[in-house]
């Protein structure tokens, strides 16, 4: 897979679980300029208080945990990415202030 300098390709997928609990990512593939601000939206439907996760899969590599939050208002952060567990809006949006070509990957929102 070739990447043009200055562009970041993000392919967005989703993971969920059974029993009616689910996560939703509305965006499809996204291409951004380097140093652009990134937001990947993730909303969920669940009973109780699930643990929320962002996973990343870089080209040619396996799935890796990027960050997690286990209770409302927890903020996960790693490698410049952040996401805050918002129970009131049932969201766990992934953000990064300045993306790089090295951020090109597939990003998965999940709950447990």
From Swiss-Prot:
A Pfam family of this chain: V-set
InterPro entries in the record: Ig-like_dom (IPR007110), Ig-like_dom_sf (IPR036179), Ig-like_fold (IPR013783), Ig_V-set (IPR013106), TCR_variable_region (IPR051287)
Subcellular location: Cell membrane
Any one GO BP annotation for this protein: adaptive immune response
Alphabetic keyword roster: Adaptive immunity, Cell membrane, Disulfide bond, Glycoprotein, Immunity, Immunoglobulin domain, Membrane, Receptor, Signal, T cell receptor
One GO CC annotation: T cell receptor complex
Signal peptide: 1-20
Membrane found in the keyword field: yes
Glycosylation sites: 41
The Ig-like domain, residue ranges: 21-112
Chief subcellular location: membrane
Subunit details: Alpha-beta TR is a heterodimer composed of an alpha and beta chain; disulfide-linked. The alpha-beta TR is associated with the transmembrane signaling CD3 coreceptor proteins to form the TR-CD3 (TcR or TCR). The assembly of alpha-beta TR heterodimers with CD3 occurs in the endoplasmic reticulum where a single alpha-beta TR heterodimer associates with one CD3D-CD3E heterodimer, one CD3G-CD3E heterodimer and one CD247 homodimer forming a stable octameric structure. CD3D-CD3E and CD3G-CD3E heterodimers preferentially associate with TR alpha and TR beta chains, respectively.
PANTHER family, alphabetized: T CELL RECEPTOR ALPHA VARIABLE 9-2, T-CELL RECEPTOR ALPHA CHAIN V REGION
Protein name: T cell receptor alpha variable 9-2
The gene coding this protein: TRAV9-2
């Amino acid at each position: 897979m070739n990447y043009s300098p200055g562009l970041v390709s993000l392919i967005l997928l989703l993971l969920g679980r059974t029993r009616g609990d689910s996560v939703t990512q509305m965006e499809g593939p996204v291409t951004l300029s380097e140093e652009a601000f990134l937001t990947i939206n993730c909303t969920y439907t669940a009973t109780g208080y699930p643990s929320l996760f962002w996973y990343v899969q870089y080209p040619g590599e396996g799935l890796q945990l990027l960050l997690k939050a286990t209770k409302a208002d927890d903020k996960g952060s790693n490698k410049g990415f952040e996401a805050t567990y918002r129970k009131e809006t049932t969201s766990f949006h992934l953000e990064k202030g300045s993306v790089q070509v090295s951020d090109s990957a597939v990003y998965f929102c999940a709950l447990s």
